């Protein structure tokens, strides 16, 4: 009789990470029993989940300090992501250059975490075609989910739907498949908004109420015109993380639709995330208004 399959000690960590329960990942890593015989690949995945969670909560220096130059490729990639996110223009350029060197190395260039980090960095750079170059071949559910995000950013919902169908064929019940389905539904609009809301509601019953889940539910309510209930969810999210970019951005939009002042949330967003797309759009609108005033003065 065949032996029982060994338990997947990273299953819970992955799902916690996917829904934005980063502290649960950090504490969950400590809870993995010492006797668990993790393979080298599993150890690298465990550590990448851990350090990516630290990045998500803003502990950039810890990641930079703990990942040494001799670390495995996935961890080197995660460290470069930290350098990119925490550094100025020089740090960003250095991180991108070193990422490109790793990607060009035939021995490690196909590593999925490396490709995922490359996609993440290039999405931040708004180089969506470049990001897709590294993620399009897939290989993991995370890479496929990133393909969906990139296609939606490129306003190619048709391609996003194709990527979603691949995910559904692989594992329809996977947490990332459910999230990707909700993202596509939100963009499609109409009756799909209710379907997206049901997905986020289901996730909220399975997992802690994270900023990601609360923002997802709030976005659905905003699409349905229910800004008051959306505001309540967003304020709950703000209590969990006062600097969360999407929470602040959605509160700006929600407040404006409720006829309330959004200046405090916008100022917080400018301070914490000066490169956020909403900040840039608002700044561009202000500049256009100023130029128009000067033209008629």
UniProtKB/Swiss-Prot annotation:
It holds the Pfam family Coatomer_E. The lineage of its organism: Eukaryota, Viridiplantae, Streptophyta, Embryophyta, Tracheophyta. Its main location: cytoplasm. InterPro entries: Coatomer_esu (IPR006822), TPR-like_helical_dom_sf (IPR011990). Belongs to the COPE family. Keywords: Cytoplasm, Cytoplasmic vesicle, ER-Golgi transport, Golgi apparatus, Membrane, Protein transport, Transport. It comes from the Eukaryota. One of its GO terms (cellular component) is COPI vesicle coat. GO terms for biological process: endoplasmic reticulum to Golgi vesicle-mediated transport; intra-Golgi vesicle-mediated transport; protein transport; retrograde vesicle-mediated transport, Golgi to endoplasmic reticulum. This is Coatomer subunit epsilon-2. The keyword Protein transport applies. The keyword Cytoplasm applies. It comes from Oryza sativa subsp. japonica (Rice). It is found in: Cytoplasm; Golgi apparatus membrane; Cytoplasmic vesicle, COPI-coated vesicle membrane. Oligomeric complex that consists of at least the alpha, beta, beta', gamma, delta, epsilon and zeta subunits. It is a peripheral membrane protein. The coatomer is a cytosolic protein complex that binds to dilysine motifs and reversibly associates with Golgi non-clathrin-coated vesicles, which further mediate biosynthetic protein transport from the ER, via the Golgi up to the trans Golgi network. The coatomer complex is required for budding from Golgi membranes, and is essential for the retrograde Golgi-to-ER transport of dilysine-tagged proteins.
